[in-house]
Amino acid sequence: MTATPAPRTSLGSLSVSRLSLGGNVFGWTADEAESFAVLDAYVAGGGNFIDTADVYSAWVPGNKGGESETVIGNWLSSRGNRSDVVIATKVGAHPAYKGLSAATIKAAVDESLTRLRTDYLDLYYTHYDDESVEVSEFLTALDDLVRAGKVREIAASNISAQRLEESLAFSDREGLARYVALQPHYNLVSRDTYEGELADVAARNGVAAVPYYALASGFLTGKYRPGSTVDSARTAKAATYLDTDRGLRVLTALDSVAAAHEAEIATVALAWLAAQPTVVAPIASARTVEQLPALLGVAELTLTDAELKLLDEASA
């Protein structure tokens, strides 16, 4: 795969591709060699926005957390391309660095930088809100990291509309670094996890959405069908959508739109997400190089108003 120019969109001061590559599989279902191949193909296909977290993949027996960052760091070091990619990681869920106290944030960022083999992060998320900590404490700590040059932009994930608004107001009032992005759980079969109050706060405040679970644990690839068996670590979660009328309606609508464009179902699901207000880049992961074209295709696929309406109605 040769390098091709790809559309970029603004995320604060950053310029990112229309698909963010999820790093949760690196060091979990993809070993280092497989991960390197996926990362190489993603960049060759025009991608530049890599998402990970310090906790990936602590849930795997024998892992401690930090495995994904380590794989990505080794790849960055071997390829010498740090300035060509946008690296996003998260703080607050690593077994050794839980929560958002100032001390935790400042210790965790240095561990992430070491594993990623870099001296700065492009985007640093609070992975889960920590309501035991005042927004003033963690935002001041994050601002310190920006001022120190360790972090370029900050963002939030898994936060309520109220706390997001409170955080933005504090940053504005105090002149501190401000969240430029929000990473919500959002896809065609999980709309109420973002739409409504949370999306309204993001839109009012110019905060970009970078949705995770963009393909609903693989359900929106279309490979899970009634009566089918899929060998995947995420099968149980994806299969739950088959038991709902909405899940089946969405698959039918995706089949129709995909056929009209001669596109993969996953590409259509991502294109719907990319067309939603505030969304700049959905996140999707690939365990193999063969899974990437359907994901990268989102940058080239524009759905018609009628197709968007069909998918809206099927997923309502």
Predicted feature residues:
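N-terminal binding-site loop/beta-alpha segment at the start of enzyme catalytic domains
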Residues: 1-83
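Beta/alpha (TIM)-barrel catalytic core signal, keyed to glycine-rich beta->alpha loops juxtaposed to Asp/Glu
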Residues: 3, 129, 133-316
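Short, acidic/polar
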Residues: 31-42, 100-115, 164-169
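Short beta-strand segments at enzyme active-site cores
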Residues: 49-53, 86-89, 120-125, 155-156, ...
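Active-site groove signature of glycoside hydrolases
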Residues: 113-132
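A short acidic, helix-capping loop that chelates divalent metal ions and anchors anionic groups
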Residues: 56-61, 93-98, 291-294
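Active-site mouth loops of central-metabolism enzymes
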Residues: 22-33, 91-103, 131-132
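Acidic (Asp/Glu)-rich catalytic clusters
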Residues: 43-44, 73-84, 113-117, 146, ...
